[in-house]
Regions:
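Conserved residues in the N-terminal Rossmann fold of short-chain dehydrogenase/reductase
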Residues: 35
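Conserved acid/base catalytic micro-environments in cytosolic active-site loops
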Residues: 1-6, 12-23, 27, 38-39, ...
């Protein structure tokens, strides 16, 4: 089943680049394009796309206004924001994500035409695969009882029932080590800004542990995300700085384009270190890079949380954290935008608790305070 895509961009060049990139991907059909926001609704009604790639900064009717119009009309379509790597582009992109955009990609600002084309293809490919999987599941659900082959396929992406049944036992076993978490580490990708906002708006201001976060995002965007989260949280939230000492009750977000690790320092302090080390799992910052540092230097002292996102980043690091006695929480499938990173961790057997997004903040608070309730 091909994903039907409508390309919206006021730039003739980018309409052509995006169209060519999408056409190079399997199971994708570009059904049309639009040069302005005002033409999106008529084009949508005519072409019935599954996905709109939406330039967020357009003259006249902006990308944000397009999203608001789609929401007012209750039109069912995924939106993939296409943004410039600028402060204004980042701020508008975060607004679009708050309004329900599926995800975003950035327009390359450097490199040759061929390199930029390949970069766009690489960014589009996993997102289109994730959208295709969601559309397939939605189609199956609309049909009611799926055929046997479809049941097998959807079962493969569901949270394993045996894991859910044994989760309280696993949680008790982790707690019996008497390792009240001194540090919370979070890994997240697609759907992350809204997921993090849900969690941080519910955390208390007196949480006695620092929180260290890797969110897959480019430079500029992570600093804006930290500001947005701080506005919705009782805790201070900021973009991490090199050699910054961790403070209880403060959250730190890895800067886009940097790897981040936690290392021990004098007097029992913990420092954040940033580097230009190579990407892992095609990501910088990478969740595995952070989790591995915590597992190596602070075994059994962390609570790890893996949230919505594409791919498997975080699973290898969680395996090390579990081996050292740390506890792991994964977001459940129903509340994920993309059930990729949590699914990989669950299937690897490195998760103690699978929880809906709305329950994660309370569980973090209880564990840090030394309560299992």
């Amino acid at each position: 089943m091909a994903v039907r895509v409508l390309v919206v961009d006021d730039s003739v060049l980018y309409r052509r680049v995006l169209t060519d990139a999408l056409k190079s991907l399997p199971d994708v059909e570009v059904v049309g394009s639009a040069a302005s926001g005002s033409s999106v609704l008529p084009k949508f009604r005519e072409l019935k796309p599954d996905l709109i790639t939406l330039d967020i900064e357009m003259p006249g009717m902006s990308g944000i206004e397009v999203m608001e119009a789609l929401r007012r009309e209750a039109l069912e379509v995924k939106v993939l924001v296409v943004s410039a790597l600028t402060v204004s582009g980042g701020a508008l992109t975060l607004k679009a994500l708050e309004r329900g955009a599926f995800d975003f990609i950035t327009k390359p600002s450097e490199g040759s035409a061929q390199e930029n084309f390949r970069c766009i293809c690489d960014e589009l490919a996993p997102r289109l695969r994730a959208i295709a999987r969601r559309l397939e599941v939605q189609t199956i659900l609309r049909r009611g009882t799926p055929p046997a082959a479809s049941v097998a396929k959807t079962a493969a992406v569901s949270t394993p029932a045996p894991l859910l049944r044994r989760a309280p036992i696993a949680a008790s076993a982790a707690a019996s080590n008497n390792h009240q978490p001194e540090l919370v580490v979070i890994g997240v990708s697609t759907g992350g800004p809204n997921a993090l906002q849900t969690i941080f708006s519910a955390l208390p201001g007196d949480l006695a542990a620092p929180i260290v976060i890797v969110q897959h995002m480019p430079p500029i965007f992570t600093k804006l995300l930290a500001g947005n989260l701080a506005a919705h949280s009782k805790l201070p939230v900021r973009e991490a700085a090199h050699n910054e000492a961790l403070s209880p009750g403060t959250a730190y977000i890895a800067p886009g384009g940097k790897q981040m690790r936690v290392v021990p320092a004098l007097n029992g302090r913990r420092l954040l270190q940033l580097s230009d080390d190579p990407p892992e799992n095609c990501c910088r910052p990478a969740v595995d890079y952070l989790f591995r540092s915590v597992a190596n230097h602070f075994p059994g002292k962390a609570l790890a949380v893996i949230l919505t996102g594409m791919g498997e980043d975080g699973t290898a690091g969680l395996r090390l954290l579990k081996r050292g006695g740390s506890m792991v929480i994964a977001q459940d499938e129903a509340s994920c935008v993309v059930f990729g990173m949590p699914k990989a961790a669950i299937e690897a057997g490195v998760v103690d608790l699978v929880l809906p997004l709305e329950a994660i903040a309370d569980r973090i608070t209880a564990l840090v305070r030394g309560s299992q309730s």
